[in-house]
């Protein structure tokens, strides 16, 4: 029988069919090799957009810098970064006029945050440029290394543990004539392996002291390391993203805190909220425009796209914005917030690993590090690379490129959103003073513009005026990539709007399935994903039930835990069958132990262990939840864990799921091969750091989360806490006198050791 596929959609409103257009099956593309070429592209492009600016030289580092601010007004439609200071300031003033007190209140909120934030805020985040080792490290390690170097150079403000004091150290470090750092290096030697009798390369790690003069230190402090952005779909070319070092991060954090506080108060801002809250906020703006245009006016919406948003933004412009926003605030606060944009005006982009050369005939490979690009003969490169290198050469210093204009990806998302909203805000009739007016939505570089006017000419005029106003502040709306529609149908940040936001369930497809963490977490994440999609993405009951059955099937194949009474043979089936036969209450067995699946769409919110607890045999309960089981290296599991789920589009999302600790919550051991590499010293530092943090958590468990405040070090805080707890336990009879005395003695010994060290 031939089925006409259009019949399937007779009962479905057209907008709900969006999930059938899903293009993203299969794995996203990942980048391999070096990101040097992409970074050079970014640097060269950014300079090209601002080429008519003024060149100056940084007196401290000798870096050539291009300043496009207040440059020539654009005469064509090419993207450009010539923002006009007075226009930006005026846009800020009008934004404040329409939202009285917005800047004042946000400054007060931020001031409170600045005074309370502790330096461990900087340990959040993944890879961070570690300036002491000149490469990327986990954030916690990079911070620890920075603090260690500061200490050994006599900077100790940070011992208080407040972020603001760490930033004082950063400022002081920039005035020092030289900074001494400890860096890791690798020695290789060829030795004969006793067992195989072959020659092998043995690597040993050394630590050596190195002095950096003021210029070298400043270059490192202002460096952003670059990497290639992975897993980007729908693009032919990869692009570079940046990761800043610890000197810049703290300052950026405070600026973004201020900008976030402003965005929260702006109805046109798509940040910092997300999900359903964001949809509700945006639907409001659309509703407002449609209600006002009902009878007499036309209303059109542009699904907007900006050309190279962050390469045309300029840190100097952000400095002007911050200066205006904080104009009535205390001097110290204004200074702290203005440092981030100043550092970005003087930033250096590290070019990454350099190029790899291969000689097919001689079977040789050699790496040309970025530092050599300034002097190497260009005859070895192909034409496009040669052009890139020639262009970037005047900007190179020590393997980094001076990059004053532009912002690099993902740095000031909130603040640039404030700038975008300030232009949307100018669309009110009292500012346009004509028959057309506009409003819209802005989320970082993505925007939707809604224009209302009595006729088509008015709509055109409104769009033109918006376009030109944007140009004045360095925003370039792309005429090629933006499209216009009657209001009611548009796309914004991958949300599709058609008389209301349409649930695009297919975007969530990649997050269905088995995550591969461990049996316990995978079961919990799997059912939580289904539950969340029923709540947020119109996943209907029948489809959810099917998704659940497919998930259980997938899970059983992944962990080879088919039901105990199945005919399927795997390498676990012998053990599982035995367990099945010995178990009295078979319904109590977890799916991962060959038990039946008791989940249906009504009980997805209950962790499997809790769901089956009453049904379990007593000895099975004892085995399952036994913290003393020697075969399990236990994570101490909070009641809620976070999983990273990958939607098809947009950034990885963090998702909470219930975690009940059982003997199935195992953690795979770390691969041993790392122990033979240059990472070993770092790994040991990291483990030491981890141990200290775990110990600290023991003394200040999150259930009693009163963080120790004040000027004590971690050790002092733990000792004083131990004394208080011991006294309470002794007085209430929980511990004996001898134990109490022993604890007090240990505390005194620790303090004595600390005194001797100092």
Swiss-Prot record:
Q: Name one GO cellular component term.
A: host cell cytoplasm
- Transferase keyword on record: yes
The record's principal subcellular location, in a coarse class, is host cell
Locations listed in the record = Host nucleus; Host cytoplasm
Q: Does the keyword DNA repair apply?
A: no
Q: Which organism is the protein's source?
A: Influenza A virus (strain A/Chicken/Scotland/1959 H5N1)
Q: How does the record describe its quaternary structure? A: Influenza RNA polymerase is composed of three subunits: PB1, PB2 and PA. Interacts (via N-terminus) with PA (via C-terminus). Interacts (via C-terminus) with PB2 (via N-terminus); this interaction is essential for transcription initiation.
Summarizing the function annotation, the protein's role is:
RNA-dependent RNA polymerase which is responsible for replication and transcription of virus RNA segments. The transcription of viral mRNAs occurs by a unique mechanism called cap-snatching. 5' methylated caps of cellular mRNAs are cleaved after 10-13 nucleotides by PA. In turn, these short capped RNAs are used as primers by PB1 for transcription of viral mRNAs. During virus replication, PB1 initiates RNA synthesis and copy vRNA into complementary RNA (cRNA) which in turn serves as a template for the production of more vRNAs.
Keywords, ordered alphabetically: Eukaryotic host gene expression shutoff by virus, Eukaryotic host transcription shutoff by virus, Host cytoplasm, Host gene expression shutoff by virus, Host nucleus, Host-virus interaction, Inhibition of host RNA polymerase II by virus, Nucleotide-binding, Nucleotidyltransferase, Phosphoprotein, RNA-directed RNA polymerase, Transferase, Viral RNA replication, Viral transcription
Which region ranges are annotated with the description Promoter-binding site?
A: 249-256
**RdRp catalytic domain sequence ranges:** 286-483
Biased region (Polar residues) positions are 55-64
Q: What is its EC number?
A: 2.7.7.48
Q: HAMAP family from the xrefs?
A: INFV_RDRP (MF_04065)
| PTM info | Phosphorylated by host PRKCA.
Show the catalytic activity.
RNA(n) + a ribonucleoside 5'-triphosphate = RNA(n+1) + diphosphate
Gene (name only) = PB1
Protein name, as recorded: RNA-directed RNA polymerase catalytic subunit
Q: Which InterPro entries match?
A: RNA-dir_pol_NSvirus, RNA_pol_PB1_influenza
């Amino acid at each position: 029988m031939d089925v006409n596929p259009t019949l399937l959609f007779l009962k479905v409103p057209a907008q709900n069919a969006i999930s059938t257009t899903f293009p993203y099956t299969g794995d996203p593309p990942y980048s391999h090799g070096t990101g040097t070429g992409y970074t050079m592209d970014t640097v060269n492009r950014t300079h090209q957009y601002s080429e008519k600016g003024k060149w100056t030289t940084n007196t401290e580092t000798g870096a050539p810098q291009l300043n496009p601010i207040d440059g020539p007004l654009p005469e064509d439609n090419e993207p450009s970064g010539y923002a006009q200071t007075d226009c930006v300031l005026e846009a800020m003033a009008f934004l404040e006029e329409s939202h009285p007190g917005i800047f004042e209140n946000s400054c007060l909120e931020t001031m409170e945050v600045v005074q309370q934030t502790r330096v461990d805020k900087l340990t959040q985040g993944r890879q961070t440029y570690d300036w002491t080792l000149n490469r990327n490290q986990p954030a916690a390690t990079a911070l620890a290394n920075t603090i260690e170097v500061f200490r050994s150079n006599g900077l100790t403000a940070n011992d208080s543990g407040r972020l603001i004091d760490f930033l004082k150290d950063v400022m002081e470090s920039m005035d020092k004539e030289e900074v001494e750092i400890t860096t890791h290096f690798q020695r290789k030697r060829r030795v004969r392996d006793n067992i195989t009798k072959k020659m092998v390369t043995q690597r040993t790690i050394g630590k050596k002291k190195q002095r950096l003069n003021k210029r070298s230190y400043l270059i490192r402090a202002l460096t952003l390391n670059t990497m290639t952005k992975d897993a980007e779909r729908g693009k032919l070319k990869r692009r570079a993203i940046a990761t800043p070092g610890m000197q810049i991060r703290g300052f950026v954090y405070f600026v973004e805190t201020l900008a976030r506080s402003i965005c929260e108060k702006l109805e046109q801002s798509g940040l910092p909220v997300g999900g359903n809250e964001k949809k509700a906020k945006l639907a409001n703006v659309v509703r407002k425009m449609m209600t006002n245009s009902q009878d007499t006016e036309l209303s059109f919406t542009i699904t907007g796209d900006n050309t190279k948003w962050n390469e045309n933004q300029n840190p100097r412009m952000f400095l002007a914005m911050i200066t205006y926003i904080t104009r009535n605030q205390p001097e110290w606060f204004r200074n702290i917030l203005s440092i981030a944009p100043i550092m970005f005006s003087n930033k250096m982009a590290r070019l990454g690993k350099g190029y790899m050369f291969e000689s097919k005939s001689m079977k040789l490979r050699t790496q040309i590090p970025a530092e050599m690009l300034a002097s190497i003969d260009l005859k070895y490169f192909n034409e496009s690379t040669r052009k890139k290198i020639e262009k970037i050469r005047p900007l190179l210093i020590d393997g980094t490129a001076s990059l004053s204009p532009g912002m690099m990806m993902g740095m000031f998302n909130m603040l640039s959103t404030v700038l975008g909203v300030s232009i949307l805000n100018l669309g009110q009739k009292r500012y346009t003073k004509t028959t057309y007016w506009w409003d819209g939505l802005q989320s970082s570089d993505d925007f939707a513009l809604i224009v209302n006017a009595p006729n088509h000419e008015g709509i055109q005029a409104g769009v033109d005026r918006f376009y030109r106003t944007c140009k004045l502040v360095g925003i370039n709306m792309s005429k090629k990539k933006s499209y216009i529609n009657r209001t009611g149908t548009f796309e914004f940040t991958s949300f599709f709007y058609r008389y209301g936001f349409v649930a695009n369930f297919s975007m969530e497809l990649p997050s269905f399935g088995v995550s591969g963490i461990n049996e316990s977490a995978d079961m919990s994440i799997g059912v939580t994903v289904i539950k969340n999609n029923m709540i947020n993405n119109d996943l209907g009951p029948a489809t959810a039930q099917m998704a659940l059955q497919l998930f259980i099937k997938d899970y059983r194949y992944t962990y080879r835990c088919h039901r105990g009474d199945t005919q399927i043979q795997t390498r676990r089936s012998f053990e599982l069958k035995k367990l099945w036969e010995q178990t009295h209450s078979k319904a109590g067995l977890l799916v991962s132990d060959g038990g039946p699946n008791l989940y249906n769409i009504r009980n997805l919110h209950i962790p499997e262990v809790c769901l089956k607890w009453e049904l379990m045999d007593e000895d099975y309960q004892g085995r399952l939840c036994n913290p003393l089981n020697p075969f399990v290296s236990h994570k101490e599991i909070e009641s809620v864990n976070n999983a990273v789920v990958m939607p098809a589009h947009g950034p990885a999302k963090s998702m909470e799921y219930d975690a009940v600790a059982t003997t199935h919550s195992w953690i795979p051991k770390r691969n041993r091969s790392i122990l033979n590499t240059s990472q070993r010293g770092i790994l040991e530092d990291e483990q030491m750091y981890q141990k200290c943090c775990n110990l600290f958590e023991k003394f200040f468990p999150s259930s009693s989360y009163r963080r120790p405040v004040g000027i004590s070090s971690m050790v002092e805080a733990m000792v004083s806490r131990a004394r208080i707890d011991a006294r309470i336990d002794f007085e209430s009879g929980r511990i004996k006198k001898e134990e109490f005395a022993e604890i007090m003695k240990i505390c005194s010994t620790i303090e004595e050791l600390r005194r001797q060290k100092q």
